[in-house]
Amino acid sequence: RRLKRIFESRYSPVIHAWSYKTNYTSAVCNIMHQESSWAEVVSSFEYDKARALGVPGERIIFNGPNKSKAALERAVAEGAHIHVDHMDEIKLLESVAQSLGKIVEVTMRLNFDTGYTEPWCRFGFNIESGQAQHAAGAIAVSPHLKLTGLHSHIGTFITEPRAYEAQVRIMAKFMRTLEDSSDVRIDFFDIGGGFPSINSLKSIYLPPEQVVPDLTEYADLICGALSEETRYRK
């Protein structure tokens, strides 16, 4: 509740999605959904669980690099938000959309160097190499796909709030590049998670309150960067 309140008081609209891979105990997930959180899933198992718990497809974010054709068919049919990780998935999703006679809104997962954390390059499309630009082009020319969102996840237990500010600004720069060179219109950013907890003392030997920044420090920089970077959008 505090995290939600902190972000919503600084920027609007904000959507929180509960990561099922973090804890998919039904009772925990239900509490998060009662607090208006969406479901963020990375597998068919997690997707099925979210639906069984009553989460509608349009409130599910389907992440992960290994989605099957059957999983994508169900997600598309139920209106889930699909994040694509690699070119093969773009081709598979295009085939699914065509077979179902739908235009599917797509979010691209990006990876890049923020300058503050070790780059997570295993998943998503790299900006620096031009891979992300190429993937965006492939989506843009498809009559069955529509690029509407950008996603990145820069790590876990990140104790430097400026890493998130850099993340937002890099994503915004890439967004402007796409929008200035095509008909693409980005509607939202998914900035992942990774905020440190004072209850999870990973490699920390001092009292957590001396090491872990308050959530307000993260929200100030993230929301401030979002406001600045989107202020003059057409």
Model-assigned labels for residue ranges:
Residues 12-188:
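Active-site-proximal beta-alpha core segment in soluble small-molecule metabolic enzymes
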Residues 159-234:
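C-terminal active-site-proximal or functional interface alpha/beta core segments in diverse enzymes
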